[in-house]
Structures are given as C-alpha cells and as structure tokens.
Amino acid sequence: MEKEVIVLNEARKVTLTAYLQDVEGEFGNIPKRPGILVLPGGGYQMCSDLEADPVAFPYLKAGYQVFVLRYSVKKDALWPQPLEDYDAAMDLIRSRAQEWKLYPDKIAVIGFSAGGHLAGAAATMAKNRPAAAILGYAVLNEDVKGCNKSAPSVVDAVDDDTCPCFLFASRTDNLVPIANTIEFMQALDRHDISFESHVYAYGPHGFSTCDSSVQDKDTNMCDRIPDWVADSIGWLKDVLGDFGKGSMTKPVCGHYASGDREAYLSVDCTMGL
C-alpha cells in the first residue's frame, strides 16, 4: 500500500491523504478498485483524528482505495469553501483515476457530524457528486447554523439527482438531534432516492467506528452500533457493484426506490425502504 499526502490549498491548510492499494498481480481479480472519500467531523472547527484514519482502515480492508480530506475549518469554513475543498478533492481523484487504479464513477463519500453535513452537501449540491454517500450522525438541517452560520441546510437541497445514501445515528445523540437524520430520510423519500438507515436506540455523539481505540472506557452505547461499518460496506456493494470478479458487477440496488424509474432494482432494496 502507498500513502500520498497532497496539499489542495496551502493557505487554508486543506490536504488530501490517499491510501492506495495494489491491483492485479496477487490481486488477479481486481484490475481497478472503487474509492471512498472520508470527511471527518469536528463542528467545522477541526477535522477529528478519530474520524479520519480509523474510518479509512475498514474500507481499505474491504478493498477500497481510500482518501481522507482535511477541509477548511474555523474562519476558513465560510461557505462554500468547504464544499469547494470537496470538489477540488473529487476533481483530483477522478483526474488521477487511471494512475490510482480507480473506477472514476464508483467513488463514494463518508462524513461524520459536520463532515456529514459536508458529505450531504456533496451528495446534493456539489459540482462533482459522489456515486453514494454515507452520513454518520450528520447535521443536515438548519441546526448546522449552530457550528457554521454560513452553511446551508442540506435537507432543503435534496433533489432527483441526489445519490443513494446510507444514514446512521443514535436516538439519544445529545449534540445533533435525531431529527436531522429523519428529515433527510423524508426528503430522500419525497424524491424517490434509494436509501438505507440505522437509528440505534442509545449512544453518544461522535462514536466513530466504536472501537475501544476511539471511545472512552465508560462510553454507554447500544451493542449493535459497531455494525454500521459492516452494514455500510455491504450497502456499498449493493449500490456500486462488486469489484472482485475481474470487473465491476451490476448494482443490485438502483438510484431510485421506484421500479418504474430504473431498469433494475432488487426486491430486497425496495422492501427495505
């Protein structure tokens, strides 16, 4: 595996870290890989280390090329600068897809808390939208004004071109109310966008992957919260296709929830919405 750190904006300290795995050779069934771009949380005041590399590693293990974006924060988070950082990162990733052995149309985004807001914005209003979005305890409605007064509601931006989404959150999150996740799901439903959602009965804000390395020893949370990691990886295979069979297979779950909107759609996906 290779690691490369690229400065996207020196003045705003915006960097993209690429974790790149080999293809072919011993990975004979993998000529290229899908990718995922990680957007850590931190209230637009920082990019949390707990939601950066610890999140990247499970997706690396699942076979993805993984990228971590440290976007504009604090005074530099004036909107739309964080979204411009995302677009610059996605531009670069797609422009180097051949070099980095990537499927350029199979790049997802994952974000947490304020990073989840940015991931939601990427899914709904970016110049270069991702193929899929994973939103963890994300601030998606007007609550975002509490950490970044210039940032828009993502709920209001959902449209027919929004990509499929996977959402997870805790019912007892005391920082980002669960209404953010619910309202975003409702907006996706109104536009017939395919989604999967997991709202856990109890747990704190900012649980990341839930490993002991990223949690306080006395953290009280639902035992099933760590399942979101494996569930999201399985969901990505549903919406992007499988890549370990010599080429990308056809997705089993389409962009839209209605079978009338697509040439293919799985029964399981339809019944899960």
What do these predicted ranges mean?
Residues 48, 69-104, 223:
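Catalytic nucleophile-loop/oxyanion-hole region of alpha/beta-hydrolase
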Residues 1-31, 83:
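N-terminal cap/lid segment of alpha/beta-hydrolase-fold proteins
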